[in-house]
């Protein structure tokens, strides 16, 4: 067979392969139009795109075509099998990084820390936060920035994984912000407690970016010490409420994992009375835990039922202390450790809060302020600075 014939055959095979691939994609797209629509992917831990509604505006601005593309991508037949095969292919090819997430050892998916130094945005946030704390000097304030798995479990990252240094960034942020020099502010460093706790138990979920309730309990030891709270570990008892938890980092990364974790609730042995009011939804409940959240798409929402702009918790505690908590979702797992020691707690999530925080502080007689974030979200967050008020930016 001469060279010309070989090239001709190769060209024919390439054309046949391309034609077959296009035909297969078209066939799957057509079949997906008649395939039963799924709302949720259990393996990816996320909601799937639904059939888009045809509209003139959508066609003109291009949103309809984008929605169709998302719908076909999410609803093609046997999606879970294809997702698993893609994950298997990535593993075979040695791909350990997708969308900011590393596939680590021991079944862990670990969100990489992207920053390595203090930037201009960080400095502006420092200025705003310091101003807020100074003008509310009547409050005894605590700032607790929680290390994530990329710091505490850095040995589980894949070898050679390029990343920012979370510990170094934290130490630089605390140092340059001079926040610890404010007389009414205590910086609560829980890194040592977490580093010690991880030796005996699991402090982070393996497929989710949150810490476990055990991790929260370990950090609370240090927080209780700094807040002068008479906390004893034996005052709480752990109960497993979910034994097959898989987190949102699977869907974010595309790294399918069969790994499942447990979700535990730490309940005080002494009975307590609680009334939780969602100020925006104007609803009340007698527990900080949500059965609906536990049984929903994201079982981590068993804590508080999710994230809301403003929640008020009144307890049976006779301490007389009233806490204002500014937080991200990491704090949700720690609320249960706080309720026995505060008569009232107002919880503000700046991402969803639209009221005037300065006015809220002026109206309420808080004794304590706690700012609790994980370092990943704190480094990226812009909502906290916005909520701290216009006065701070002047």
Features from the language model and the residues they span:
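Extracellular glycan-modifying ectodomains
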Residues: 1-394
């Amino acid at each position: 067979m001469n060279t010309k014939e070989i090239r001709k055959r190769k060209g024919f095979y390439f054309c046949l392969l391309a034609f077959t691939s296009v035909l297969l994609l078209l066939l799957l797209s057509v079949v997906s139009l008649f395939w039963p629509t799924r709302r949720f992917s259990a393996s990816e831990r996320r909601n799937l795109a639904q059939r888009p509604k045809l509209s003139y505006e959508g066609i003109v601005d291009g949103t309809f075509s984008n929605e169709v593309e998302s719908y076909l991508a999410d609803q093609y037949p046997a999606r879970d099998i294809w997702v698993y095969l893609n994950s298997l292919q990535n593993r075979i090819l040695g791909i350990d990084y997708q969308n900011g997430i590393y596939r680590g050892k021991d079944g862990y998916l670990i969100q990489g820390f992207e920053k390595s130094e203090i930037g201009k945005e960080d400095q502006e946030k420092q200025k705003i936060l310091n101003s807020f704390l100074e003008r509310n000097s009547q409050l005894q304030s605590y700032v607790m920035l929680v290390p994530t798995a990329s710091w505490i479990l850095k040995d589980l990252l894949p070898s050679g994984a390029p990343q920012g240094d979370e510990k170094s960034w934290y130490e630089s942020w605390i140092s340059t912000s001079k926040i610890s020099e404010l007389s009414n502010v205590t910086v609560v460093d829980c890194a040592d407690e977490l580093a010690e706790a991880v030796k005996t138990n699991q402090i982070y979920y393996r497929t989710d970016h949150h810490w476990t309730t055990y991790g929260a309990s370990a950090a609370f030891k240090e927080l209780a010490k700094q807040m002068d709270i008479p906390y004893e570990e034996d005052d709480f008892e752990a109960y497993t409420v979910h034994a097959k938890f898989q987190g949102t980092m699977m869907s974010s990364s595309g790294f399918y994992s069969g790994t499942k974790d447990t979700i535990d609730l730490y309940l005080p042995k002494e009975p307590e009375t609680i009334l939780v009011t969602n100020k925006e939804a104007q609803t009340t409940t007698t527990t900080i835990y949500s059965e609906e959240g536990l049984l929903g798409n994201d079982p981590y929402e068993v804590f508080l039922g999710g994230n809301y702009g403003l929640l008020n918790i009144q307890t049976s505690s006779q301490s007389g202390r009233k806490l204002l908590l500014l937080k991200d979702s990491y704090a949700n797992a720690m609320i249960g450790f706080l309720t026995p020691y505060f008569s009232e707690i107002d919880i503000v999530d700046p991402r969803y809060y639209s009221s005037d925080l300065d006015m809220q502080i002026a109206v309420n007689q808080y004794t304590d302020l706690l700012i609790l974030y994980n370092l990943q979200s704190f480094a990226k967050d812009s909502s906290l600075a916005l909520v701290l008020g216009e006065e701070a930016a002047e």
